[in-house]
Design a protein with these regions (language model features):
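Amphipathic, charged-and-aliphatic alpha-helical interface segments
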Residues: 52, 59-64, 84-103, 124-137
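A positional/architectural concept
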Residues: 1-78
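Glycine- and Gly-Pro-enriched alpha-helical subdomains that act as flexible
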Residues: 112-115, 125
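A general alpha-helix detector
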Residues: 71-72, 86, 106-110, 150-158
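Strongly charged, low-complexity linkers/loops
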Residues: 125-167
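A short amphipathic alpha-helix within small helical-bundle interaction modules
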Residues: 76, 91, 99-104, 111-112, ...
Length: 167
């Protein structure tokens, strides 16, 4: 799985970007509107959390500004009748937090505000996901730290790992 792509932003549209890595590989990544709004200018460095979908006819990368958005996307894919395009559409219409809250609170009206989600689909989302979002914690703001105070993280590349305590 390709969990993250970082490099120079060479192209951006409302629904997709292209990132050229330092190794010279360019990745086309499908994104929700919320991710587009936080992108840097063309030519600047960008980093996206990604989810790879392998189909018979294509390999598609979906990218998100935060790991939280990616986790919500992955959970929504587990609902009956929801594919990557609809899940991405949900995150383009609602923030990840609002989507999770709507499902937990069984808010049919909010869910039906998403294009291609009618009453039956909203009910199915609630049925399939209401009890499966309990461990999905919010860290949607770029740079947010969901870990407990004092947690450690590893920074640096291969052979250059540096451990530090979180403030």
């Amino acid at each position: 799985m390709i969990a993250q792509v970082a490099g120079r932003l060479v192209s951006k549209e409302l629904d997709r970007v292209e990132i050229l890595t330092k190794s010279g590989i360019g990745y086309e990544i499908l994104i929700p509107l919320s991710t587009y709004e936080g992108l840097p200018k063309l030519g600047e460095d960008a980093s996206l959390h990604t989810h790879l979908v392998v189909r018979e006819d294509a390999w598609l990368l979906y990218g998100f500004a935060t790991a939280y958005e990616r986790r919500v996307f992955q959970r929504v894919l587990n609902a009956k009748g929801v594919g990557p395009a609809l899940a991405l559409g949900m995150l383009s219409t609602l923030t990840a937090e609002r989507l999770v809250r709507a499902i937990r609170e069984k808010d049919l009206a909010t869910l039906q505000g998403v294009p291609r989600v009618g009453r039956k689909k909203a009910e199915q989302l609630i049925l399939d996901l209401a009890d499966k979002l309990g461990d999905v914690q919010g860290d949607s703001a770029p740079g947010a730290r969901p870990e407990a105070p004092g947690a450690t993280s590893c920074r640096g590349g291969p052979g250059r790992a540096r451990w530090r305590a979180r403030p």
